[in-house]
Amino acid sequence: MSRPHLQQNVSFQDTKPPSRRAGRDDIPPRPPTKSDPSKASLTTTTTVQSVGGYNNHQLDFDDNAYVDAGSSNPQGFSDYNGVRRKKSMVRPERERIDPNHRLWHYREHAAEDQVDIQPSSTGNQPYNQYNNQRPGANLRRGKSLLARETDDVDDSSGLNIFKRGATIRRKASRATPRQAPTGAQSNRVSAGQKEDEECCCLGNFAPGPKNCWMIYCYLLTICIPGFVIAKVFGKKTPDAQRAWREKIGIVSIVLYLMGAVGFITFGFTQTVCGDTQLRLPGGSANTGSLVINGYDYDFSTWRHPVAGDTFNGTTSPLYMDQYMAGGMDASFLFQNVNQNCLGLITPASGTGIDHDGDQMGWYFPCNLHDQNGTSAANLTGITDRTNCHVSSYARSNFSAVVPTAEIYYTWDRVKDESRNLAVYKSAVIDMNLLQWLDDTQVSYPEFFNTIKNRNDSYAGKDITALIERAGLSQYARCLTDVIQIGFVDTITIGCIMSELVLYVSLVFILGAVFIKFGMAVVFGWFLSWRMGNFKGESYQERMKRAAEIENWTDDIYRPAPGYLRPNATGTARTGVKKNFLPTTSRFSRAEPMLVSSSRPSTSYGMVGETRRQGSSIYGNKLGPPAHTTPPGSPLLRNSRSSTSLPFRDDSRHSISDRSVNNNVPCPFPLGNVVPQPAPDFEPFGYPLIHSICLVTAYSESIEGLRTTLDSLATTDYPNSHKLILVICDGMVRGSGSKQYTPEIVLGMMKELVTPAEEVEAHSYVAIADGHKRHNMAKVYAGFYAYDSETVEASKQQRVPMVLVSKVGNPLEVNDAKPGNRGKRDSQIVLMSFLQKVMFDERMTTLEYEFFNAVWRCTGIPPDRYETVLCVDADTKVFPDSLTRMNACMVNDHEIMGLCGETKIANKSETWVTMIQVFEYYISHHNTKAFESVFGGVTCLPGCFSMYRIKAPKGERGFWVPILANPDICEHYAENVVDTLHKKNLLLLGEDRYLSTLMLKTFPKRKMVFCPQAVCKTIVPDTFRVLLSQRRRWINSTVHNLCELILVRDLCGTFCFSMQFVVFMDLVGTLVLPAAISFTLYIIMISIIPQSVTGMPRPYVSLVLLAFILGLPGVLIVITSRKIAYVGWMLVYLISLPVWNLILPAYSYWHMDDFTWGETRKIAGEVKEEAHGGKEGTFDSSHIVMKKWAEFERERRWRTGTASRDSQYFDVVQRANSPRSGIPSNRYSIVSTSETFNSGLGTAESNHLFRQSQSFASMSQVAPSPETNYGNVPQLALPPPRGASIGREHSPSSTESGTSNNYAYGSTEEPTASNVDPYYQPFTNEVYQDEAEQPILPSEYTTTSPEPVYQTAPARVRQPSQRGVSLVDTGPVRSAQAAPHDAVRRVSRHQRRSSSKNQLVSPISSGGHTGSLPPGAAPPQY
């Protein structure tokens, strides 16, 4: 809750402040200053306007509530910000919920239950009748994750909920202070203005958003005008030209990164450590060189100039017998005189050395000495200048010679006690050479005599500090000039930095490689066989199964072993638990529908006792009235899986049967559905859950579709718990096919619930821009029809199947691909449908027909399904894969998605398929295995993966929507794709983006890899198709990693986190061309001899390369023991230039190509186009959106089975109530199954059903009696209860012989004498645990018991809405969340025991009202 704007002192003493949602633009109040005169008086208060039905509150606070804004406070708050609540790392309830929050849309959907009005159907903004304020005005729908904006809706449209532009109404409402628009409207208005306005001096240079990135791309390509792009590069439209400019921007970043990698690899060392000369250890100079003043000079080919009679210009002193100078130290022949020693070494009196004052010609005798320091002092010819090279000519010639190397000495040699060496700074001096000074010829300091003989104070040490402290630095510099023999073995700071960068990079790269390798080994040895494993499965059985899988994957058409595919006629009940003692008796209640599962129910009701309830021996069959139950009936919402149908296997009654007294035909005949097994039927050791097998089809062939559907239909998962759903993306024909893809699929169906010729197309909101946002589709429901040539008759199971065929809107009848909206749209058809079912939101006519189709072919309401298996239409699934994937889901509720292993069926077809075998293998068993250890698989392949629709939460029956989460559906259903980033995410890499969305929305849940689940597929066999496929994959990978790198909540921290791994993957993917080029370069210079290259061998790089390329082979050997894959690895290594150079480079340059290229070819298409283009204007008037209950009311009214008034006020009279002749005063806002076919007074009446309590019968909220019902559009309020309903009562209600003392408006309650003994009055339970209490507003709280039969009130009651329900229960009041609880928990109604003989209604609330579905959290500020 954000604070109100404060003008004076307030205090927070009242317990229930008004609840509101903070807007994104809300500004926290400034705290009062110390000079504020109101500070001294705490009696002044500020009245806050009542909101949401709460009373007005007076708020004030004391002196210590705020710190002075102008003072410096110790907490570190800025002077102008004041006190603000900071985000906490350990208190998630304190995090600020803004439109960028990962659960923003989910909380918005949950908070909408608090709004006191229904969504508008006219486009007018609704107002609160109490204070003229729109409830929920502070609710901000927020921006899309990808900043979705659009303004393409026709102004004359009737459904303005799709409006995103700046309409006149929105502008007017924005200008009116008291009618502030919602956050969604304001966001869309501002965004619409932003796209149209010009950007500084650049003008309107590109369509779409003009952010810093687009400005950079435009400036980078400003020298290339649009007409050049259109003529040369073929980009005609402004959107295509924008994508081309963005592509150039991304290519520039790739080049920057590759240049940076190349500089770090090669240039950095040369830059910071490139001036280092060749270094030779002291004493290692060869006979072809001389050592002079610490440097080695190569004189092997040098000839001494003509000098007297000794040298004639063709001889070298190195090889003359009188010199033999090769390998000697000739420093005394080229002495550094009169520099640092000037004034220190002076001529002695009577010296024979040439001198001029203090300047001398030489100091030492000009003789050679050994480079190892073994020569004794030789003072011969000290006055002879022949060898001293003192002339300027000799000195200039010597200076022209470049030294070959530096002579260096290690510290071990410096400390050699046989020598008298010392180090000054970096120079090594031989103090024994001072003995060559003749004191009769030169004068020198006494310090030289101190050190010329070995002195432990100086010898073998670094004397730099000692010399500096003693003030003898000039002496040391002089010694460096005359007796330096080399340099100490040191390394420059640049070389240190170079090596540091090298080894740090090595550590990170090898660390990542070894950690990934180690985790993959851990996964392969300890985790992989546990995932999806069945209890009691031995190691030998697992190895046998692995061998059978390898044989199975050799051919795409090879069937799996017969024993793994169950027989169609099998009725094995091996998993049924048997009890020694009987569980029923003749006194047991006849409740075949009320046997609950051991797992929590999929419906929202009350959490009650979890003990199993057996069926009575007298109640094995249900009467026909119970068989006419429509979807959403209370008969179907008490268990998760085992009691979804109103009959048992031993019941021979058809649901479409009619009773003698019930002549109304059942609208949903279910006589041919697959029976549901017993609740304790666990053939695989875990409770069964309902699964949808989603197959997205586009232009596949008959063989490909048949292969996929056969494999799904013959899986060993029970048919009662699986549904095959095929969504055909448009009326398209594959290349060479004579039939449209929907026609092919429809030919594979039988026993359609509605004849194919009678199926009509229904509208829905598609993922597109322009008029294509309106799409139409047909829904066919039936059973899968096998081909006896592909599946033997004994294996042909009866599997329900639904086909959704997109046929397009009337404007695209003549298009090449009518109805085609992309694979993402096909997935959203299902995801959006599941979300609307879970949240009881308005749905389109297609989704309503979809709901009924699922019900009619399965007998299972769609909200019962928990998982969805996504399979491409060219994939064949191993028979037990679905079972093993569901086992992972059931055993670990934290898993929200998983994928199996995809194997190649055409391994040896061409060289193109051969190079892909190991790539597929290592991507699963190395990359995904490593990510699975941490529960963060970043990419679940769309060809074979499973997602969790909803997850159980706790032990009280709560559910958390996962795939059906509004945040995931909202972001995944992005319809305006106007940037290169969004196009690569949503048009090419939709499967990977869905994985990214789930990780961003639920970073603490798991995405895992299940190697036990296996499928096989056909990979591209030509390089052209492979190039097109990998272009899509690589580009989508880059953009998805960019999204995933922003997720901060992944496991780990800093460098030891999945976020850092994602960053390394991103950089590694972008620099792949440079990496393979550098690899080839290193291999080449390693092969070429060092004498030719002149460079040392890169051993570190070679070791790194060996680990990177060799560890996958080791992984194969120690985990799978499939030696054949080592051969495939060698093929892969040979093809590395293709994978790392050709494919990435091609992909980056074609990043603005958003088509599927050669992967999917269709007939009749000249040039393929992407799905993101905008054509025309979207007119939403063609789309009708209502809640399921409203559709159902209208259907029943149109078929004449119920009056129009019955949709507002019904008396529910149960067919099998204890006293069928006494009508029940159960008031319902909907026409339920019991009012549709009550069947009172029939011979089948019994005590099966519990007395149901509806929301309407318990709601304590009523509108004003003066409400004008005529002005309420579409979702009109019910008429007063005293009004005539006009509904014909059932025969039993009029012929029962009992007077109708409980008609509408009656105030008389039944007495104990006229109530059946089996009737148990409803009472409000007293909750002992605070966590069990439903969260109720104060005005709803009741403490006294309430009888189940209530008299009809004088005016219509508004029903309350609770959790997820498939009925329209009307508006509700705002509920106050517990201040200490960050998560809003809405308890389901406690299921009463069978002895109370009651059945929970789908709209039952048990007398309590909540406003948020399970797991929803109110905003916390």
From Swiss-Prot:
GO terms for molecular function: chitin synthase activity. Palmitoylated by PFA4; required for proper subcellular localization. GO terms for cellular component: cell septum; cellular bud neck; chitosome; incipient cellular bud site; plasma membrane. It comes from the Eukaryota. The chain crosses the membrane at residues 213-233, 248-268, 506-526, 1068-1088, 1098-1118, 1123-1143. Residues 1-56, 112-137, 170-189, 592-658, 1256-1319, 1338-1421 are annotated as: Disordered. Pfam families: Chitin_synth_2, CHS4. Glycans are attached at N551, N567, N906, N1035. Residues 1-212, 269-505, 1089-1097, 1144-1421 are cytoplasmic. Residues 124-133 have a biased composition (Low complexity). Its main location: membrane. CDD domains: Chitin_synth_C. GO terms for biological process: cell wall organization; chitin biosynthetic process; protein localization to bud neck. Belongs to the chitin synthase family. Class IV subfamily. Polymerizes chitin, a structural polymer of the cell wall and septum, by transferring the sugar moiety of UDP-GlcNAc to the non-reducing end of the growing chitin polymer. Activated by CSR2, it produces chitin that is deacetyled to chitosan, which is required to maintain cell wall integrity. Conversion of chitin to chitosan offers an advantage during infection, as chitosan is less readily detected by host immunosurveillance mechanisms. This is Chitin synthase 3.
